[in-house]
């Protein structure tokens, strides 16, 4: 029995693949420049990881003062997200999730660097671990924002289908309808399951 689109279960990975670029323009980027920028990103995200570990795990950051500036700490960060004290846990989880997701991306960049620059085999087991850790941070953020993975995935695919009605095209990637995409995000418009 052939299933129609309405009967098929929603498969985010398959749906995402439909809107992925099939092209790779490696000749447009010098390898040395790629390696340099990759290292800068890794260094910045490692510094952010040290901040995350200080903020959420109590580790010593090793910074006692900031020269030339009045020292102000990060205690007020949750208040900048929400002015309601009863929502401080949510605000802290939002901060933790965003910083944590970025630091997991840094670990994936290290895996890419090891392969692309150092010539080591790509470590699939490590990549899976980092994706899983990224999911953990995504779950923390989703819960704090009252969202679900299913809802996020369906809305994301609806946005991408708006951008690429049939499949990925370079024209559509470079000429986006940002207002239409934002409307989909705000409405939580979902693809049919």
Regions of interest found by a model, annotated:
Residues 1-131, 135-193:
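Flexible "arm" and connector segments at domain edges
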């Amino acid at each position: 029995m052939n299933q129609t689109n309405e009967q098929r279960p929603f498969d985010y990975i398959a749906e995402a693949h439909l809107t992925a670029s099939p092209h790779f323009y490696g000749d447009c980027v010098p390898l040395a420049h790629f390696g340099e920028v990759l290292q800068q990103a890794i260094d910045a995200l490692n510094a952010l990881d040290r901040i995350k570990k200080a903020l959420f795990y109590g580790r010593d950051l090793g910074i006692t003062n900031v020269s030339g500036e009045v020292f102000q700490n990060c205690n007020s960060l949750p208040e900048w997200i929400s002015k309601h004290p009863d929502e401080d846990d949510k605000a802290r989880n939002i901060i933790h999730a965003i910083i944590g997701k970025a630091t997991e991306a840094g670990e994936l960049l290290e895996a890419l660097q090891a392969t692309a620059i150092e010539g080591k085999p790509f470590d699939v087991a490590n990549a899976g671990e980092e994706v899983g850790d990224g999911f953990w941070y995504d779950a923390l953020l989703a819960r704090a924002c009252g969202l679900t993975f299913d809802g996020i995935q369906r809305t994301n695919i609806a946005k991408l289908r708006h951008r690429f009605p049939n499949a990925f095209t370079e024209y559509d990637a470079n000429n986006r309808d940002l207002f239409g995409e934002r409307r989909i995000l705000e409405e939580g418009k979902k693809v049919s399951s």
